[in-house]
From Swiss-Prot:
A lipid is attached at C18 (N-palmitoyl cysteine). A lipid is attached at C18 (S-diacylglycerol cysteine). Monomer. It comes from Borreliella afzelii (strain PKo). This is Basic membrane protein A. Belongs to the BMP lipoprotein family.
Length: 339
């Protein structure tokens, strides 16, 4: 689906700018949110949507939502610019290249991107990126998985292999090994964030192989995995991602590795609107310390003593006593140091 959704005006008054004061002098500012895929993914995109919706509690804005796809990124962004958007949010690493391109082409516009994959190259002054230490939250849920697994086998189901999902994977695997060096971990990618059936298929195979807990980071594929866990019933568990996904299968979702995209988006935009200053040209990084990543407490399935251990681990991560790996290289280094 590739349609433009215009939402009603929200309450409040705001002013926009870019690395200084904005050219906006009157009228109601327009904030746009562009995603790859659909807003109803019950995870990443939905979290971003919820974040901008919360702005209505403080500000009067016109919110424009756009569901896009790779072959229409440029035309969609051009349309939003021409429609008068003051700030355009791009949700997901797939927008990394196009975000830099349009920022350089349209210096009068303001852009923000979630999960960009940039190395050390300069970032345009009218672009800001939000990155996350998702591995820190995944470390905690990996620890939980290893502690509560009955079979000694746990799994990881990823979407598209790359920096973003790898952070979840290796954080999860490291946390599990930190809890139990003998735990068996099986990880697999399905090559998509929109293939529900592939997620179902891989999850079914993992459960049949004796894995009793799967952490997913696969978008709709993960929703398929949750469905399978629910259908199979007791003894088949799953760890959600980005948001608390326990409502999808209350008896099977042990916890979720949270990456509060919506909160980070809301924090930055709120400050932007209140101060009339856009702090672009940089990446802003969030983790456990900032309260943006973490895990969902679930006394029903997580023993009290394990939650106490998690609290201690969280402090060690925040204080940098434990440095959580985010890719294969740092994971192998972690194993040599801690396991």
């Amino acid at each position: 689906m590739n349609k433009l959704l215009l939402l009603i005006l929200f309450e409040g008054v705001i002013f926009l700018s870019c690395s200084g004061k904005s050219g906006l002098e009157s009228g109601i500012p327009k904030v746009s949110l562009v995603i790859d895929g659909t807003f109803d993914d019950k995870s990443f995109n939905e979290s971003a949507l919820n974040g901008v919706k919360k702005l209505k509690e403080e500000f009067e804005i016109e919110l424009v939502l756009k569901e896009s796809s790779t072959n229409s990124y440029l035309s969609d962004l051009e349309g939003l610019k021409d429609a008068g958007s003051n700030l355009i949010w791009l949700i997901g690493y797939k927008f990394s290249d196009v975000a830099k391109a349009v920022s350089l082409q349209n210096s009068e516009m303001k852009y923000a991107i979630i999960d960009p994959v940039y190395s050390n190259e300069p970032i345009p002054a009218n672009l800001v990126g939000m990155t996350f230490r998702a591995q820190e939250g995944a470390f905690l849920t990996g620890y939980i998985a290893a502690k509560v697994s009955k079979t000694g086998k746990i799994g990881f189901l990823g979407g598209i292999e790359g920096d973003i999902v790898d952070a979840f994977r290796y954080g999860y695997e490291a946390g599990a090994k930190y809890a139990n060096k003998d735990i068996k971990i099986f990880s697999q990618y399905i090559g998509s964030f929109s293939d529900l059936e592939a997620g179902r298929s891989v999850a079914t195979k993992m459960y049949s192989d004796g894995i009793d807990i799967i952490h997913h980071a696969a978008g709709l594929g993960g929703i398929g995995a949750i469905e399978v866990a629910k259908e199979l019933g007791s003894g088949h568990y799953i760890i959600g991602v980005d948001e608390d996904q326990s409502y999808l299968a209350p008896n099977n979702v042990i916890t979720s590795t949270t990456k509060d995209v919506g909160r980070s988006l809301n924090l930055f935009t709120s400050n932007y609107l209140k101060t009339n200053t856009f702090e672009g040209g940089k990446l802003i990084n969030y983790g456990l310390k900032e309260g943006v990543v973490g895990f969902v407490r679930n006394p029903k399935m997580i023993p009290f003593e394990v939650e106490k251990e998690i609290d201690s681990l969280s402090s060690k991560i925040i204080n940098k006593e434990v440095i959580v790996p985010y890719n294969k290289e740092s994971y192998e280094k972690f194993l040599k140091e801690f396991i």
